[in-house]
Amino acid sequence: PQMAVIWTPENRFRIWFEVEAHACDAMAELGIIPKAAAKAIWDGGAKAMAALKASPAAEVEKIDAIERVTKHDVLAFTTWLADYVGPDSRFVHQGLTSSDVLDTTFAVQLTQASDLLLEGIDKVLAALKKRALEHKHTPTIGRSHGIHAEPTTF
């Protein structure tokens, strides 16, 4: 279940928003867009993310409906986001390509998935260590070149 959540549209859209909003922060720091606009994007985005969390299926369907018209996933998302952000949404995605957003999001998702896998590996290693210590002195048949050899222990 945890791994599946990483690959849901809701998580993908949440990461898209964060990528877009952080890009706006950077552009505001450089004086490319007003700092107030970056704040408005975060504020409106927080409302959008709350709506996405409260009614994921309905909000994803809204984005999907826009995409069926625009034939463009990121444009559909930014259009949906604009309903929550308002006039300052014109600064969202400015200076970015869709690949900037998609590739960064994919990297974040891979990191999230890797973290889960590493957590699982730690549990497997702990279980293996426990079993190895438990059977440290358990006798077994040794093998050499695929045939039985002298007895040994695990």
Give the positions of each predicted feature.
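A helix-coil-helix interface module used to build multimeric assemblies
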Residues: 1-154
